[in-house]
């Protein structure tokens, strides 16, 4: 269901639900993840059902996120996600980019090259396939096919540094990043590693270098670096120089990790 409900996240010893403005309760019968209850009880939030199922009860998973009114200007946000200490491929952290509410994620894994909504990128709960394996605490696919991808909301897994730029041409920027996704999904698969993007390369074809090339193509031509943190710092430096000339509004902030038992603290790369 794509119906989005807003209300106050409410929890007591026996129950949890969304209390709506008209006094009605929603999701009272559903399992609401403890991470949401611990961080956001008493706050205004949005919620909807995901198509993925909770392994405990077979019901659709409830996703909850902060109720923040959307921007009414074209914007982009560049994200530098700190590294996950559990996984060596995460040694350098990760980059992603949001254009007008659509997050472009590029990865060495073919199925993680996608456009994803803000709430699913940052705030998916550690339930069902998004959770770490109960036996190893890591990514695991069991013999019966049950998957634990250990891929829940990024803000519960790490601290994220944000470069926000308002006043861009959103449709032009989106078309650039859409073309990169098409290119990746049209790359012939290596039959020995069908789950991997065959042309991935840390120095020339990675999450951060694709974003760097896209921003250069858009017009920020001097951004350089190839690791996520380097590209983030270079982009901030270069785009700040453009802000008066291009009538852009530029800001930087961080989203501290929302600590939950399913993820250790992230670290700077």
Locate the predicted segments by residue.
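Second-shell loop/turn segments in exported
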Residues: 83-86, 158-168, 193-202
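Phosphate-binding glycine-rich loops and adjacent basic patches that engage nucleotide phosphates
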Residues: 131-142, 166-178, 201, 205
